[in-house]
């Protein structure tokens, strides 16, 4: 069942979240650099809003009697943990005085989720692209703050958009 779903529509969530994150990153980066106003960082909240909405509207038709396998549940759990972790830490970074290297944390977390998905499904492109994002993440601790969004966008391009297009 999971293999059939993988062949039919597993690329959609990768593409939705990859493109939403990439475009939001470019929007936030451009507005903050152009205006010098950090309040534009609130645009990061577009990611869960647009990503969740598009995921809902682009999901496949629900078939009656569809069996949810153990692998389906494991993948759901992997992404639930990754998503809740990313959401919680993003809210901490946006709305508290605690300073986190949030782009590093999010890229690392999502890279681990993508790599785990690839390993669980034995889909090598997702495993390798997730690993590439994990390896890219520490670079954001090294580069100047102005260039961190570029690495973040590149990481999402590699870990979500590339495997998503390979699947579709």
Region locations from a protein language model:
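C-terminal membrane-adjacent module
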Residues: 1-2, 12-17, 21, 27-32, ...
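Selected alpha-helical membrane-embedding segments in polytopic membrane proteins
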Residues: 4-92
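Hydrophobic alpha-helical transmembrane segments of multipass integral membrane proteins
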Residues: 18-22, 26, 49, 84-87, ...
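Hydrophobic alpha-helical transmembrane segments
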Residues: 27-33, 90-96, 114-121, 137-145
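Structural signature of hydrophobic alpha-helical transmembrane segments
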Residues: 39-50, 93-108, 153
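C-terminal ends of transmembrane helices
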Residues: 53-71, 112-119, 161-168
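Membrane-proximal helix-loop-helix units in multi-pass membrane proteins
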Residues: 70-130
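Terminal transmembrane helical module of multi-pass membrane proteins
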Residues: 116-168
């Amino acid at each position: 069942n999971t293999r059939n779903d993988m062949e039919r529509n597993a690329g959609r969530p990768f593409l939705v979240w990859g493109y939403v994150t990439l475009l939001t990153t470019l929007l936030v980066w451009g507005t903050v650099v152009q205006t010098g106003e950090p309040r534009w960082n609130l645009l990061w909240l577009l990611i869960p809003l647009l990503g969740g909405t598009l995921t809902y509207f682009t999901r496949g038709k629900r078939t009656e009697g569809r069996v949810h396998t153990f692998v389906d549940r494991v993948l759901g759990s992997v992404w639930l943990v990754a998503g809740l972790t990313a959401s919680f830490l993003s809210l901490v970074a946006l709305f508290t005085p605690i300073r986190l290297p949030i782009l590093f944390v999010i890229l690392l977390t999502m890279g681990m989720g993508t790599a785990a998905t690839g390993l669980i499904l034995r889909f090598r492109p997702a495993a390798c692209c997730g690993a590439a994002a994990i390896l890219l993440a520490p670079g954001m601790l090294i580069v100047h703050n102005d260039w961190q969004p570029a690495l973040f966008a590149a990481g999402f391009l590699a870990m979500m958009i590339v495997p998503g297009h390979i699947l579709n």
